[in-house]
Every structure is written in C-alpha cells, then in structure tokens.
C-alpha cells in the first residue's frame, strides 16, 4: 500500500502540474489576446500607408499635367483640407524642401534619402522639423520637376505622430498597453508608450540595458525582428513583469511590438 509520504509527494506533484497547466493556459490566453490587438493595429497601419502612397501617386499625376504654380497650390491645399495631412513638400535628394506656399527648409529624415530615391521606391520615414513634433513622412519619387524655381526629386506628405498613434490603440487593459513600431535593427519609428520616462531610440538597446533578458535571448529576439517573425515572451523591466508580443509588418520591414504588465493582463 502507498505510504503517507508517497501520497503527499504524489499530491504535491499533481498540484505542481496543475499550477503549471493553469499558468501556461493564462499565458497562452493572455498573449493570444495581445497578439489579436497588435494584429488589428498592424492592419490599420498598413492601410494608412497604402492609402497615403496612393494619394501621392494621384498628386504626381496632377503635377505631370501642369506647371502652373497657382493651380498646383490650390490643388494641394484642397487635398490637404480633404485628407488631413500636416504638410506637403517638394523634396530634393539632400532633404531640402519647398512647400506649396514657397516656404523652404530642411527635413531632418532618419535615413539616407539620396540612396532611397535612387532605388525609385516609395519611402516611409520618421522626420523632424526644428521646434516641431516628430512626423511620419510618406515620400514618392515618381515625378521630378521644378516648382517656383525649386528643383525637386520627389514629393512628400507628412503626419504628426499623434495622428499615427491613434491607429495604435493602447486603450485596452485600462490604457496600460504600450506599442512601438520599429525597424528590424531595433530603431524606433513610432513610440506609443505609456508612463514614458525617457525617449526610446532603439528597442533592442533598451532591452539590453534595462531588462532581465540574457544576451542569448536578446540575440534570438533581434533575429526574429530581422526576419520579420512574430512571437511573444515575458520580460522584466525595472520592477515590472511584462508580456511582450511582436509581429512583422509588410510595411518597409517594420515590426510592431506590444508591452503590457502581466498583472494588468491577468486581472482583465
């Protein structure tokens, strides 16, 4: 017959297995919900990019049909009113621009624009103007020409990041979900973090400096980002344990990342 000690050990074993099963079930259900929310934001971001690139090609066709500066200005100002973009730029390969009103300046783009334009492909990048908020800029090199004496190699429209962030809904989990859009090398395109204490410029570097992940785990995650894979894991930042979910996008080799505190998700 089974002695009391064996029964206790067997009961303890069953208890541990049950707790492990419950923990794994909670983890799978929680990350599945997070992945669903991230996928929804991903689709909305892709649709935003598709629509705005389509607008740029439409504007290019108009620019090819006329060289009348006043007509061009009226057309673009009407388009801006209808669509709601922040700015329209005639852009040279070195980042200098002119607006339809004739204002000139330099668009601080986070990329080597001349190399990108040489490829002849549409571009979506982060940019900043002095004293203004970060912007997401859509660039189309389909048409080159001159506007009010300014020679341009591409046209572009911009949105302030606040407008883009509306797509990355962090209202779930009582507003405790942080979302990021990153390049595959970890550089941050869009930072939609809650309770932000400092700007994150590279997500991988942030994890290396501030998380409990080993170097091997970080390298594996970096490879997932580089290959556009999807996945999930737990990570500790400071004193808080988080679910981290990520999904590659079809937009310019970006990856979307979501971070939500474990205790918030498990309480939902």
Regions found by a protein language model. Name each.
Residues 69-83, 154-206:
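Solvent-exposed, extracytoplasmic
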Residues 93, 97-171:
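Extracytoplasmic/periplasmic ligand-binding sensor regions of membrane-associated signaling proteins
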Residues 2-4:
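Short, small-residue-biased leader/transition segments that mark boundaries at the very start
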Residues 144, 156-168, 185, 250-254, ...:
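Helix-start (N-cap) segments at beta->loop->alpha junctions
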Residues 207-268:
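Extracellular/periplasmic juxtamembrane segments that couple receptor/chemosensory ectodomains to their
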Residues 56, 86-91, 177-180:
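Short, hydrophobic-rich beta-strand element in sensory/regulatory alpha-beta domains
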Residues 100-131, 196-234:
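Extracytoplasmic/periplasmic sensor domains and loops in membrane signaling proteins
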